[in-house]
Regions:
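Domain-level signal for soluble alpha/beta catalytic cores
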Residues: 1-179, 185-295
């Protein structure tokens, strides 16, 4: 089963038989005080640098979040999307908790977006799924509701059942366009959340075969050595059935771990992408050494 996300000129497929999809997380003001101040002043120049760094790192889709307090988020998100699609052909994941901002972003986008996100809450689905249908988008869905963020895989799976039923039968969203986020949680707060996540991913794949994503950094939040933890977490999640992640595309360690997992899972045929990347790295090392020798 494939989820199709595309820009005006480029298409990306999410699927269990496809390379793992790296969704760049960087265009997000959360925890970035200077970036927030720039956005409040109407300065979007940092976005251009974020795009360039993530493209160079290997991002395949770019998540865009403009959730800055004391700003007009719909206007800011629309401007950011217009800017990003003017400088890269990578597809976009439109990330907002504000329904009005999502609609402005979807209207501004020249492609088929991934919407981030809905939950199993009835009011959230009622507000956003009509937009997903109207703009022929795909949507990320989280199995939590007003009552709780469940820890048990069985409870999460029950909420996935609800989301799938409501989205497909009440709003006509194709199953392939529902991308479940099984809820990666901080291992520093509870040592069992990693195991629970992998079990949830596996159960969702067995029941529905649909695509899944997560905020990969959530797993290592509050811990030292976050790149190392992410580089262990992601291949294990991929083996369980995860097909994409909103992640730090500027981390060579995590990106390499994902690409290695593609080889091991049989989604990089004959390891050709891995070999090509390795040769490029060796050529860069050789060029740097030769340049140093001539100084």
């Amino acid at each position: 089963m494939h989820t199709v996300i595309r820009s005006a000129t480029k298409e990306v497929l999410l699927g269990h038989d496809q390379k793992f999809c790296i969704i760049g997380e960087r265009i997000n003001p959360t925890g970035r005080r200077i970036f927030q101040e720039q956005l409040r002043a109407g300065d979007l120049s940092a976005i251009e640098r974020d795009v360039a760094a993530q493209v160079a790192g290997g991002a395949m889709i770019l998540d865009i979040n403009m959730g800055v307090p004391l700003t007009d988020e719909p206007d800011l998100l629309g401007r950011a999307i217009t800017l990003v699609q003017s400088i890269t052909d990578l597809p976009i994941c439109i990330d907002s908790s504000v329904v009005e901002a999502l609609e402005v972003g979807l209207a501004a986008y020249q492609g088929r977006a991934l919407v981030n996100s809905i939950t199993a809450e009835d009011d959230r689905m009622a507000a956003i799924l009509p937009l997903v249908k109207k703009y022929d988008a795909a949507v990320i869905a989280l199995p939590n509701d007003h009552d709780e963020i469940p820890m048990e895989p069985e409870k999460r799976l029950a909420l996935v059942d609800k989301i799938v039923r409501v989205a497909t039968t009440e709003y006509g969203i194709p199953l392939a366009d529902i991308v479940i986020d099984p809820l990666a949680m901080p291992i520093g707060a509870d040592p069992q959340v990693g195991r629970s996540f992998f079990e949830t991913v596996y159960a969702i794949r067995q029941r529905y075969g649909i695509n899944m994503t997560c905020g990969a950094g959530n797993n290592s939040f509050g811990m030292p050595g976050r790149d190392e933890l992410g580089a262990s977490f992601l291949p294990m999640a991929i083996a369980s059935g995860l097909t994409s992640a909103i992640m730090e595309a500027r981390s060579p360690r995590m990106v390499s771990a994902v690409k290695a997992a593609d080889v091991v899972m049989g989604n990089d045929e004959w390891g050709m992408a891995w070999i090509g990347d390795y040769r490029s790295k060796m050529a860069a090392v050789k060029a740097a050494a030769e340049a140093l020798a001539t100084q």
